[in-house]
């Protein structure tokens, strides 16, 4: 049975950037890696309702710079920036170095795999029919310009005795094409029947040379030279 590699992992350094960008010596690497893990775990727990897409971490000159990509920046910042200041203090304490928090707004949450998966999971927890939630997410993504999207849910769907998986796809999702910009993420819905897993793949187009590919127009071939009509011989 074929297995699927993680769409981000196989594209790292090709069309996908790393979520942590820093360089460390051998003796500091493990501490930095553990610090990144703890910072992400803390922020995801604190900002559970803030529609956080991803968290990127940089470590310039014995400090830490955290960028939070969210669809609801107002919730993260808080009144007069109070909440973000509390986060900065907590992150500095966890990392053990001065911290800086940046907020980046996600303009189109319908095209972000993490936010789409979280949305479907929250609907399943509110007892929305799973097929309706899947179809709504697919339609919204395609309406906003996605080239393709696939959604899969697994578990005791509809309270069934036996767990199963169902998926819905529209457009094309080329998992083997390395230059394809595919956003992938997962979420969990905790229902009364157990946990339902949600997976989302969104194909946004192909990337060539660091830029989105543009549909190339077929080159016009030069017209072949006209042949002189055959005569009956030389005069």
UniProtKB/Swiss-Prot annotation:
Keyword field contains Lipoprotein: no
- One of its Pfam families is KH_2
The cross-references to PROSITE patterns, in alphabetical order and at most eight, read: KH_TYPE_2, RIBOSOMAL_S3
* GO MF terms, alphabetically ordered: mRNA binding; rRNA binding; structural constituent of ribosome
Q: Which residues form the KH type-2 domain?
A: 39-107
Q: Which domain of life is it from?
A: Bacteria
Which terms are listed as keywords in the entry? Ribonucleoprotein, Ribosomal protein, RNA-binding, rRNA-binding
One biological process term in Gene Ontology? translation
- A GO CC annotation given for this chain: cytosolic small ribosomal subunit
What does the UniProt function comment say about this protein?
Binds the lower part of the 30S subunit head. Binds mRNA in the 70S ribosome, positioning it for translation.
The record's listing under PANTHER family reads: 30S/40S RIBOSOMAL PROTEIN S3, SMALL RIBOSOMAL SUBUNIT PROTEIN US3C
Similarity field: Belongs to the universal ribosomal protein uS3 family.
The record's note on quaternary structure and interaction partners says:
Part of the 30S ribosomal subunit. Forms a tight complex with proteins S10 and S14.
Name recorded for this polypeptide: Small ribosomal subunit protein uS3
